[in-house]
Each structure stands twice: as structure tokens, then as C-alpha cells.
């Protein structure tokens, strides 16, 4: 481990570089896994190759998460809030998070820091090559790019493939799709202490639609129009919704500084079933996105730590990914939301209206106890969820 070996493969007559780990994709999960492997006593001398197609990563992502006290990424935060607001036609609730904060991290400083840290480890290479395929040979993995062929003991793949979801019918597929405007106003209009977590007072149009407002200063904020639904909108429809929302808030004079747009898969599909002896899917490609909310970053933190501990203990990768009760909760929620997409505001209003903030955020963070989860579930229309549970149980959910 830690030594790059070049040898001649007689069958292909190619010189292949033998590596311990190859990581496909240099995004949040790939870089963080490489970083943690490089810091692990058991793995820090391992030879690691990160393959990514884009050398110029900018602020292509914004990650938000709840955290109590100080955290690993605090020095990189764009902002954090001690209060969040939930609003719908039936409830308007500002939640004091106490010793917990809602934190926002933009991707560029994160990428820059991890690339800097990784560059200090001579056992890690970073190459900008597009992967064209890979194959688990049992004793090793062959990885092909447009320029080269590589061989490794273990491959971690963070490249998400939408076709996996499109080619199956067993699990409903929604998207958390959004368009956000970073705006600057000439006069103070924003409450910097409070993030608007969900504002369902916007027209729902028989879907689950809400506004998300993250103020950085009294004159700077991200205004994001978000949907949990099956199909994307035309860009003009997102933009029109944001304009209408700002107009309703009497924010008419502003400069559009930056635009952010994206789509996150919301599905309980068991991505881990594509893992093999030596190939492990990570990040959204591995099902690390919280299916019912689209949150990913906190899971990446937990999963990369657990995965490196797992590898360090010489445990087989096949034993790493397991279903838990939260997977089932997400599956039932998405079953209901996909069939009754117009009920999203009602479902979230019930949860936020009938539960304490601590209970809600522990539940969404998959850190709650079973009794707390029972109380959360009582917030939802019981008959609807029980009916869907039995459909799943007896395989009649289609």
C-alpha cells in the first residue's frame, strides 16, 4: 500500500497502474471520502486515484444541514441561523433552534479546502478524465477512461445514473427541483436571524411547492423556488414564481447577483444492491440522499466516517449498506406523496404544527428514538399511511 506499481498486462499489452482505491467523481462524497481515507491510520498510506471530468468546479452546489454546537465545516460556512420559519395556509411558526443551528455551506470553499488537504498527501492522485466504464473482475477492478485504463482493489463510484431510476417501477421517483436567485437590495429588507425553511403560501397547483429564503445580510439573500414533484418546469415558471413572491413581500428593487438551479432525486430505491465485492456506490449514487427531503450533506459526513471505520476494521464492503426503519418511513412517505402530490403542504404542516422542533429535526436527521417517531407519524393522516403500508406489505403498491 502506498506504492504505485506499473506492470504489463499480457492479455491487453497495456501498462496498468495498480491502486488501492479509485474514486469516481470529485464531488462532495468523493472528495470527503478521499480526505477521510488520507487521515485514517489504517488507510493514509493507501494509493488513491480520484477521477473527475470537470477541473473547474465553482459554486455548483449549496448544502444546508442542522447541527448542534461547533462543527467540522464551520470555518467554511456562508451563514448559519438560530431560527427557522415554517409557513403554510394553516400555520405560521418561527422555531427557535436553541443550541442547534441551520447551517449553509457553498461548494467552492469546500472543494478548495479538500483539494488543498488532499494535495498534501503524495499517495493521492487527482486526474481529470471522463470514465467510460468499469468491471469488477473478482480480484480487482478495471476502470476505463477516455485516455487510460486503471486497475484497483476497490472502486468507489459517486457518479449518479438517472437511468437506474427510470428503468424501474417498484419505487416512486420524485425530484426536489429548484431555481434560486441570489439577490441584493439597496435597503435592508431581510431578517438575518431567521431562515424561511418552507413557505407553502405560494400557489400549489396540485403539487408540493414552496419558497425557501436564506438571508446572509439585511440586503443579501437566496430566494429559492422548490418543488417535490415528478416533472421539471420550464425555467420561466420558476423565475415567474420568484418574481411574484418578491413582489408580494414588497421587494421590488433588487439586483440579481447569481442563479442556482438543480434537481435532486427523491427515491427509496436500494442503490446498494448494485454494489459488488470490490465496487461500492457512494453519495447520491449510493442512496445517501435522504429520500423524503433531498438532504445529502449530513449523510455524507456520517457515511464517510462510518465507511472508513468499516474499511479500517477490514470488514467486507458487502456488509456496510443496510436498510433501517428510516428507509421504510421515507418509502411510505414517498408512496403517499407521489400519489397525492397536492397534499405536501398539508403533510408538512401537520408535522411542524404538532411536534417540537427538537423532535422534528432529530427525526429528519435519523437520530430519533422509536417513541418520538410514533409521535411524528401520528401527525400524518393515519388511514392514508396505514393503507399504503399494507399495500407495500402485500406487494400491491402500483
Protein language model regions, located:
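N-terminal Rossmann-like FAD-binding beta1-loop-alpha1 element of flavoenzymes
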Residues: 19-44
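Predominantly flavin-linked oxidoreductase catalytic cores and closely associated redox partners
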Residues: 125-246
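N-terminal Rossmann-like dinucleotide/flavin-binding domain of flavoprotein oxidoreductases
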Residues: 81, 85-91, 106-125
Amino acid at each position: 500500500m502506498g506504492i504505485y506499481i506499473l506492470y504489463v498486462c499480457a492479455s491487453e499489452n497495456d501498462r496498468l497502474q495498480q491502486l488501492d482505491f479509485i474514486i469516481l467523481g470529485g464531488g462532495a462524497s468523493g472528495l470527503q471520502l478521499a480526505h477521510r481515507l488520507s487521515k485514517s491510520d489504517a488507510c493514509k498510506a493507501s494509493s488513491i486515484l480520484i477521477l473527475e471530468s470537470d477541473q473547474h468546479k465553482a459554486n455548483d452546489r449549496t448544502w444546508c444541514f442542522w447541527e448542534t454546537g461547533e462543527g467540522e465545516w464551520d470555518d467554511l460556512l456562508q451563514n448559519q441561523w438560530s431560527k427557522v420559519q415554517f409557513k403554510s395556509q394553516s400555520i405560521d411558526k418561527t422555531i427557535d433552534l436553541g443550541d442547534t443551528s441551520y447551517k449553509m455551506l457553498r461548494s467552492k470553499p469546500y472543494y478548495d479546502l479538500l483539494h488543498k488537504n488532499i494535495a498534501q498527501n503524495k499517495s493521492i492522485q487527482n486526474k481529470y478524465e471522463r470514465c467510460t466504464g468499469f468491471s469488477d473482475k473478482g480480484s480487482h477492478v478495471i476502470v476505463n477512461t477516455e485516455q487510460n485504463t486503471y486497475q484497483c482493489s476497490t472502486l468507489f463510484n459517486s457518479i449518479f445514473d438517472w437511468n437506474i431510476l427510470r428503468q424501474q417501477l417498484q419505487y416512486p421517483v420524485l425530484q426536489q427541483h429548484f431555481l434560486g436567485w441570489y439577490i441584493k437590495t439597496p435597503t435592508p429588507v431581510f431578517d438575518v436571524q431567521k431562515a424561511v425553511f418552507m413557505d407553502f403560501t405560494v400557489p400549489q397547483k396540485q403539487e408540493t411547492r414552496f419558497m425557501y429564503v436564506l438571508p446572509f445580510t439585511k440586503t443579501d439573500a437566496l430566494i429559492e423556488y422548490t418543488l417535490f414533484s415528478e416533472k421539471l418546469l420550464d425555467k420561466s415558471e420558476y423565475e415567474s414564481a420568484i418574481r411574484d413572491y418578491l413582489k408580494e413581500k414588497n421587494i421590488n428593487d433588487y439586483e440579481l447577483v447569481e442563479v442556482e438551479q438543480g434537481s435532486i432525486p427523491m427515491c427509496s430505491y436500494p442503490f446498494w444492491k448494485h454494489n459488488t465485492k470490490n465496487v461500492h456506490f457512494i453519495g447520491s449514487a449510493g442512496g445517501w440522499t435522504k429520500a423524503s427531503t433531498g438532504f445529502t450533506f449530513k449523510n455524507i459526513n456520517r457515511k464517510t466516517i462510518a465507511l472508513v471505520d468499516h474499511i479500517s476494521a477490514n470488514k467486507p464492503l458487502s456488509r456496510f449498506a443496510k436498510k433501517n426503519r428510516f428507509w421504510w418511513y421515507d418509502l411510505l412517505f414517498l408512496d403517499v406523496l407521489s400519489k397525492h402530490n397536492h397534499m405536501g403542504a398539508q403533510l408538512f404542516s401537520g408535522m411542524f404544527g404538532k411536534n417540537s422542533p427538537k423532535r422534528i429535526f432529530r427525526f429528519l436527521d435519523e437520530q430519533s428514538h422509536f417513541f418520538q417517531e410514533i409521535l411524528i407519524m401520528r401527525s400524518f393522516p393515519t388511514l392514508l399511511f396505514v393503507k399504503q403500508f399494507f399495500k407495500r406489505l402485500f406487494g400491491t403498491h402500483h
